[in-house]
UniProtKB/Swiss-Prot annotation:
<keyword id="KW-0479">Metal-binding</keyword>
<protein>
    <recommendedName>
        <fullName>Structural polyprotein</fullName>
        <ecNumber>3.4.21.-</ecNumber>
    </recommendedName>
</protein>
<dbReference type="InterPro" id="IPR025775">
    <property type="entry name" value="Birna_VP4_Prtase_dom"/>
</dbReference>
<dbReference type="InterPro" id="IPR002662">
    <property type="entry name" value="Birna_VP2"/>
</dbReference>
<keyword id="KW-0167">Capsid protein</keyword>
<feature type="domain" description="Peptidase S50">
    <location>
        <begin position="501"/>
        <end position="723"/>
    </location>
</feature>
<dbReference type="GO" id="GO:0006508">
    <property type="term" value="P:proteolysis"/>
</dbReference>
<comment type="function">
    <text>Capsid protein VP2 self assembles to form an icosahedral capsid with a T=13 symmetry, about 70 nm in diameter, and consisting of 260 VP2 trimers. The capsid encapsulates the genomic dsRNA. VP2 is also involved in attachment and entry into the host cell.</text>
</comment>
<keyword id="KW-1035">Host cytoplasm</keyword>
<dbReference type="GO" id="GO:0008236">
    <property type="term" value="F:serine-type peptidase activity"/>
</dbReference>
<feature type="site" description="Cleavage; by protease VP4">
    <location>
        <begin position="474"/>
        <end position="475"/>
    </location>
</feature>
<feature type="site" description="Cleavage; by protease VP4">
    <location>
        <begin position="431"/>
        <end position="432"/>
    </location>
</feature>
<keyword id="KW-1146">T=13 icosahedral capsid protein</keyword>
<dbReference type="GO" id="GO:0005198">
    <property type="term" value="F:structural molecule activity"/>
</dbReference>
<feature type="site" description="Cleavage; by protease VP4">
    <location>
        <begin position="723"/>
        <end position="724"/>
    </location>
</feature>
<feature type="site" description="Cleavage; by protease VP4">
    <location>
        <begin position="500"/>
        <end position="501"/>
    </location>
</feature>
<keyword id="KW-0720">Serine protease</keyword>
C-alpha cells in the first residue's frame, strides 16, 4: 500500500505534482501539465470581471469582461486559454487538477501607487443564472464562507483551486478537424455530451389583415462557448401567400446582441394560388458557430419569428410545432459550471492584471501524435479514492477553500501535505487534536486546520517532548468520576474524592486531601445569593503537568458580602480591574475598557454546583488571559435579571472590548470538555454558538436553562492521548454510570529533565500554559518569518526543534524589549504624544516594549475613540430626553443604540419608544426648491431663457435626491454648471460695434475764459519745466 496519496497531492498543489485519477476509467492516456499565462489590461472605469471555469476539461479556462460606465454594460475583452490548444493534438481528455492565481504588480505610466481590490466567489451554477455581477453584489451569490473571499488588495492576489465535484467522469471529445484528409476540413467541437433544451410551440388559427404580420419572440439561456443548433419540427398551415422570417440573436451576459452573430432565415410562398398551403417548420433550422467559436461567450439565444400576410385581404394561419436547442458539449461536466467570478474595482486604467496557473489533464492524443507518445492505462485505487472522498466531504472542518488569498494558499500548502500521509504516529495525532476524524478516515490521523494556526504553537510543539508529559500514558486527563449533578467532578487530579460523586453534597464528604501533589478539594461555598457562569480553561501547574487540566471548568461568581466572609484569603489573591470593579484570582494583561459591571467577581474551580452550593478549592490556580471575560458579563447579566444561586446550562469563552466579544484560542481543547459534558460553548470563535456582542449574549442567556440535577444522557465519545493507550474510542463521559471503570494509580507525571531544560533555558521559570500560549501568540503575530519556519518544521517532523525555537523566542521577549535604545524611545514618545493630541490613545506599555507603533494599534485606538464618542453622544441624548428616562436605564439605552449603525434621530427615538419599526427610512419631505441663489449668479438682468436653464439644473439635482436638496459636492457641481452656462451665453452673444464717445473740442474763446488761478498755475508749471509760455 502507498504511504502517501499522490492524487491528493496534485489536488492541493497542482504546480508541483501530477498523478492519475484513481477511479474506474481505464483508458490509455498521457498526463500533461498545461500552463495559463495572461496579462489583462483594465479599462477606463477601473472595474472588470474575470470568469473562471475551474473544472473545465477544455482549453477555454475563462474570459475577461470590462465594465463600460458610459453604456452600463459588460464589454467582452478576451478568452483565457491554456498555452496549448488541446484540440489540435488531442482527441479526448479530462481534468485532473488545477490552480489559477490572479494578481497585479505592474503600474501603468504616470501611476505611482497600486490601487484596487478583488472580490471572488465560487458557485455551483452557470453565469446566466446570476442577475447581478457588480463588484458590490458578487459575494452575495453564495453563503458558504469557504467559497468566497472579499476586499483583497490586487497586489496581494487570490488563488482559485480546482476541487473535484465527482469521480468516474467520462473523457470529453475535445474537438478536432475532421476528416483530416480534406483540404478544407470542417471544425467539429464536442460531438458528445450535448445539452438539449426545448418545448412545444403552438399558434391557434389567427387572422391577420392584408399586408399585416404576427410576431412571436422568446429566449432561452444556453451558456455556451461552442456550437449551438436550433431544430424545428411540425408545420404551419396558411391560407394564400405568406412570408416567414426567423431572426436568431445570440446574446451576451449584458443581454445585448453579440456583434456579427445574428442569423436570419426567410421562407415565402409568394406566387402560389389561393387556398390552403403548408410549410414544414424544419425550414427554420439553423446552426450557429460550428465553423468558428463565438466571438464572445453566449449567455442566451433570442428567437424572433415574423409571420407576414402578403395578400391585400384578411388571411389566416396556424402553427403546431416543437423546437429543440442543442448546445454542443453543454452537458460536459465542468464546461460551464461550477463558476468562479472574480470582480475587481478601483484599479488605474491600463493596470496589468496577471493571470498565471496550471491545469493537469489526462489526454488521449490523436493518431499522428500517438506514434511518438507512449501511453499508459489509468490507475484504479479504491483505497486512495475513498480516502479522498472522506477528505473532501470534511473540507469545512479541514479548512479546504476553493478560493483564497495567495498568502493563505501558500500557508495551506505547508501544512495540508499532512493530509496526504497515511502513516501518522498516534502520539503526533493526539497533539494535533485529530480524534474527531479518526473513525471516519481509515483510522488515519487527519489534522484540523484550525489547530495548525500559529496561535496554537505551544500545543503543536508538544508533539515531540511536552506531549509525553501533558498527554502521558498514565492518568492522561480522562475524567473518572460519575456525577449526576450535571457538572464535572474530581477529574484525575482529585481521585481520592471521586467516590462521593454520586451522593448528595455534604460537607462530611469533602475532607481535605493531604496529598501535596493536588489542589486541596476541601471547601463548599454558599453562593445562593451570587450570580455565576461557567468557562473552560487550559492550565499547567508549576513543575507538575496535571493531565486533566485541559478538561476543567471554572466559574465566575459575583462577590457578595457573605461570600467575602467565606474566603479569608481574598485580599491576598491577585486581581485586575474591569468595568469599574475587581476580578479576583486572575492575572490578565492588556485589559481594555469594558462595559460597566455591577459587582466584583472571583474565578474559582467548579467541582460541583448544586442548589446554591459550590464545591471548590481554597488554593485555586490563578487564571491568566482574557477568555474568561465573557463568562463574567454573562454572570453580570444574570445579576441584573435577579437570577441567583445557579448558572446557565452553558459555558462561555471570549474576551470583551467595549460591548464586542473577541475571538480566543484553544477552542478545540475547550470544546472537548463541553462536547463530552453535553453543554454548549458560547463565544465569537469559529465552531462555537455565536455571541458577537453583549446584546446578543443577553438574548442567548434567556434561551438557556440552568444547571440542575438530571438523569445523565450519553453524549459523543471523547478521546485524549492517554486514554488511547487503552481504547482510543472509549466513552469517557463523566455523566455515565460506569462504576467498574478502573482508576489509574498515577495521577500526575512530572516533566522530564529534557523537557525541563527546554523551558528553563536562560534561567527562566516555567510559566503556566495559558501564559505561554498568550506570550507565544503575541510574539508570532509580530514575527511572520517565525510562523513560516514553524510550518516548515512541522512538515519535517521536527517537533522538538519547534519547541526550542518558539518557546525560547517567546520567553526572551522582555530581553528584546530592553534593547530599545533611548533615542528610539524618545521618538516613540513623541509619536505617542502626537497621537494623543489627535485624540488617539494606544497602549503605551505595549508600544514601548515592542519598539514600534503598528497600523493595527492606531486603527484599534481610532475604533475605540469613535465608539467612546458615540457612547458620550448617546449619554447626552439620554440626559436630555425625559421620555427615554421613564422607560430605560442609561446603560440599556446606550447598549442598544451602540449596536446600530448610526446615531438615532428624534423621530427614530419616538418610534422606538412606541414599539414601531424605526428602521424603515422616513419618507422625504417636500422641500422648497431654492433657485434664487443660483439665478443671482447670472447677473442683475438675466434672460428668461437663462433662468429656465438654471431651474432645470436645480430640478435635476432635487429629483436625483428624491426631493432633498443638493449635497456639498452637488452644490459645487451646480455652481460650475451655472458658470459654464454663463460662459456659453457670452460666447454665443451677437457681437455689437463698440460705442466711441464723441470727441469734445474746446473753443479758443472757452480756453481764454479759464479762471485766472488756473492760468497762473499752468504758467508756473511750464516755467519749472523750462517750457515756453507761448504755445503755438
Amino acid at each position: 500500500m502507498n504511504t502517501t496519496n499522490e492524487y491528493l497531492k496534485t489536488l492541493l498543489n497542482p504546480a508541483q505534482f501530477i498523478s492519475d485519477i484513481p477511479d474506474d476509467i481505464m483508458i490509455r492516456h498521457v498526463n500533461s501539465a498545461q500552463t495559463i499565462t495572461y496579462n489583462l489590461k483594465s479599462g477606463a472605469s477601473g472595474t472588470g470581471l474575470i470568469v473562471v471555469y475551474p473544472n473545465t476539461p477544455s482549453s477555454i479556462s475563462g474570459f475577461h469582461y470590462i465594465w463600460d460606465s458610459a453604456t452600463s454594460n459588460w464589454v467582452f475583452d478576451q478568452y483565457i486559454y491554456t498555452a496549448q490548444e488541446l484540440k489540435d493534438s488531442y482527441d479526448y481528455g479530462r481534468l485532473i487538477s488545477g490552480s489559477l492565481s490572479i494578481k497585479s504588480s505592474t503600474l501603468p505610466a504616470g501611476v505611482y501607487a497600486l490601487n484596487g481590490t478583488f472580490n471572488a466567489v465560487w458557485f455551483q451554477g452557470t453565469l446566466s443564472e446570476v442577475s447581478d455581477y457588480s463588484y458590490d453584489r458578487i459575494l452575495s451569490i453564495t453563503s458558504n464562507p469557504l467559497d468566497k473571499v472579499g476586499n483583497v488588495l490586487v497586489g496581494d492576489g487570490i488563488e482559485v483551486l480546482s476541487l473535484p465535484q465527482g469521480f468516474n467522469n467520462p473523457y470529453v471529445r475535445l474537438g478536432d478537424k475532421s476528416p483530416s484528409t480534406l483540404s478544407s476540413p470542417t471544425h467539429i467541437t464536442n460531438t458528445s455530451q450535448n445539452l438539449a433544451t426545448g418545448g412545444a410551440y403552438m399558434i391557434p388559427v389567427t387572422t391577420v389583415p392584408g399586408q399585416g404580420f404576427h410576431n412571436k419572440e422568446f429566449s432561452i439561456n444556453v451558456d455556451s462557448v461552442g456550437p449551438v443548433d436550433i431544430l424545428w419540427s411540425g408545420q404551419m398551415t396558411m391560407q394564400d401567400e405568406w412570408t416567414v422570417t426567423a431572426n436568431y440573436q445570440p446574446l451576451n451576459i449584458s443581454g445585448t446582441l453579440i456583434a456579427n452573430s445574428q442569423r436570419t432565415l426567410t421562407w415565402s410562398n409568394t406566387g402560389v394560388s389561393n387556398g390552403s398551403h403548408y410549410m414544414n417548420m424544419n425550414n427554420l433550422n439553423v446552426s450557429l458557430f460550428h465553423e468558428n467559436p463565438p466571438p464572445e461567450p453566449v449567455a442566451a439565444i433570442k428567437i424572433n419569428i415574423n409571420y407576414g400576410n402578403n395578400t391585400n385581404g384578411d388571411s389566416s394561419f396556424s402553427v403546431d410545432s416543437s423546437f429543440t436547442i442543442n448546445v454542443i458539449g453543454g452537458a460536459t461536466i465542468g464546461v460551464n459550471s461550477p463558476t468562479v467570478g472574480v470582480g475587481y474595482q478601483g484599479v488605474a486604467e491600463g493596470t496589468a492584471i496577471t493571470i498565471s496557473g496550471i491545469n493537469n489533464y489526462e489526454l488521449v492524443p490523436n493518431p499522428d501524435l500517438q506514434k511518438n507518445l507512449p501511453m499508459t492505462y489509468g490507475t484504479c485505487d479504491p483505497h486512495d479514492l475513498t480516502y479522498i472522498k472522506y477528505i473532501l466531504s470534511n473540507r469545512e472542518q479541514l479548512g479546504l477553500r476553493s478560493v483564497m488569498t495567495l498568502a493563505d494558499y501558500n500557508r495551506m500548502k505547508m501544512y495540508m501535505h499532512v493530509l496526504t500521509n497515511y502513516h501518522v504516529d498516534e502520539r503526533e495525532a493526539s497533539s494535533f487534536d485529530f480524534w474527531q476524524l479518526l473513525k471516519q478516515i481509515k483510522n488515519v490521523a487527519v489534522p484540523l486546520a484550525a489547530t495548525l494556526a500559529p496561535q496554537f504553537a505551544p500545543i503543536i510543539g508538544a508533539a515531540d517532548g511536552l506531549a509525553n508529559a501533558i498527554l502521558g500514558d498514565s492518568a492522561s486527563g480522562r475524567p473518572v468520576g460519575n456525577s449526576a449533578s450535571g457538572m464535572p467532578i474530581s477529574m484525575s487530579r482529585r481521585l481520592r474524592n471521586a467516590y462521593s460523586a454520586d451522593s448528595p453534597l455534604g460537607e462530611e464528604h469533602w475532607l481535605p486531601n493531604e496529598n501535596e501533589n493536588f489542589n486541596k478539594f476541601d471547601i463548599i461555598y454558599d453562593v445562593s445569593h451570587s450570580s455565576m457562569a461557567l468557562f473552560p480553561v487550559i492550565m499547567m501547574e508549576h513543575d507538575k503537568v496535571i493531565p486533566s487540566d485541559p478538561e476543567e471548568l471554572y466559574i465566575a461568581v459575583s462577590l457578595t458580602e457573605s461570600l467575602r466572609k467565606q474566603i479569608p484569603n481574598l485580599n491576598d489573591m491577585p486581581y485586575y480591574e474591569m468595568g469599574g470593579h475587581r476580578v479576583y484570582n486572575s492575572v490578565s494583561s492588556n485589559v481594555r475598557s469594558g462595559n460597566f459591571l455591577r459587582s466584583d467577581y472571583i474565578l474559582l474551580p467548579c467541582y460541583q454546583l448544586l442548589e446554591g452550593r459550590l464545591a471548590s478549592s481554597t488554593s485555586p490556580n490563578k487564571v491568566t488571559g482574557t477568555s474568561h471575560q465573557l463568562a463574567i458579563y454573562a454572570a453580570d447579566d444574570l445579576l441584573k435579571s435577579g437570577v441567583l444561586g445557579k448558572a446557565p446550562f452553558a459555558a462561555f469563552t471570549g474576551s470583551v472590548v467595549g460591548s464586542s466579544v473577541g475571538e480566543v484560542f484553544g477552542i478545540n481543547l475547550k470544546l472537548q470538555l463541553t462536547d463530552s459534558l453535553g453543554i454548549p460553548l458560547l463565544g465569537n470563535s469559529p465552531g462555537l454558538v455565536q455571541v458577537k456582542t453583549l446584546t446578543s449574549l443577553d438574548k442567548k442567556i434567556k434561551d438557556m436553562g440552568d444547571v440542575k440535577r438530571r438523569t445523565p444522557k450519553q453524549t459523543l465519545p471523547h478521546w485524549t492521548a492517554g486514554s488511547a493507550s487503552m481504547n482510543p474510542f472509549m466513552n469517557t463521559n463523566p455523566f455515565l454510570e460506569e462504576l467498574d471503570q478502573p482508576i489509574p494509580s498515577n495521577a500526575a507525571k512530572p516533566i522530564s529533565e529534557e523537557t525541563r531544560d527546554l523551558f528553563l533555558s536562560d534561567g527562566q521559570t516555567i510559566p503556566s500554559s495559558q501564559e505561554k500560549i498568550a506570550t507565544i501568540h503575541e510574539y508570532l503575530l509580530e514575527h511572520k518569518e517565525l510562523e513560516e519556519a514553524m510550518f516548515s518544521l512541522i512538515s519535517q517532523g521536527r517537533g522538538r526543534s519547534l519547541i526550542n525555537m518558539v518557546v525560547k523566542s517567546a520567553l526572551n521577549i522582555e530581553t528584546q524589549s530592553r534593547e530599545v535604545t533611548g533615542e528610539r524611545r524618545q521618538r516613540l514618545e513623541r509619536k505617542l504624544r502626537n497621537l494623543e493630541n489627535q485624540g488617539i490613545y494606544v497602549d503605551e506599555s505595549k508600544i514601548m516594549s515592542r519598539g514600534r507603533i503598528s497600523k493595527e494599534d492606531t486603527e484599534l485606538a481610532m475604533r475605540i475613540a469613535r465608539k467612546n464618542q458615540k457612547d458620550a453622544k448617546l449619554r447626552r441624548i439620554y440626559s436630555n430626553n425625559a421620555s427615554i428616562q421613564e422607560s430605560y436605564t442609561v446603560d440599556d439605552f446606550v447598549s442598544y443604540w451602540m449596536e446600530q449603525e448610526s446615531l438615532p434621530t428624534g423621530i427614530q427615538i419616538a418610534m422606538w419608544l412606541k414599539g414601531d419599526d424605526w428602521s424603515q427610512p422616513i419618507p422625504p419631505r417636500v422641500q422648497r426648491r431654492h433657485y434664487d441663489s443660483y439665478i443671482m449668479m447670472l447677473g442683475p438682468s438675466p434672460t428668461q431663457e437663462q433662468a429656465d436653464a438654471v431651474k432645470d439644473l436645480v430640478d435635476d439635482i432635487y429629483d436625483r435626491n428624491q426631493g432633498k436638496g443638493p449635497s456639498q459636492e452637488q452644490a459645487r457641481e451646480l455652481s460650475h454648471a451655472v458658470r459654464r452656462l454663463i460662459s456659453h451665453s457670452l460666447v454665443n452673444q451677437p457681437a455689437t460695434a463698440p460705442r466711441v464717445p464723441p470727441r469734445r473740442i474746446v473753443s479758443a474763446q472757452t480756453a481764454q475764459t479759464d479762471p485766472p488761478g488756473r492760468r497762473a498755475a499752468l504758467d508756473r508749471l511750464r516755467r519749472v519745466r523750462g517750457e515756453d509760455n507761448d504755445i503755438v
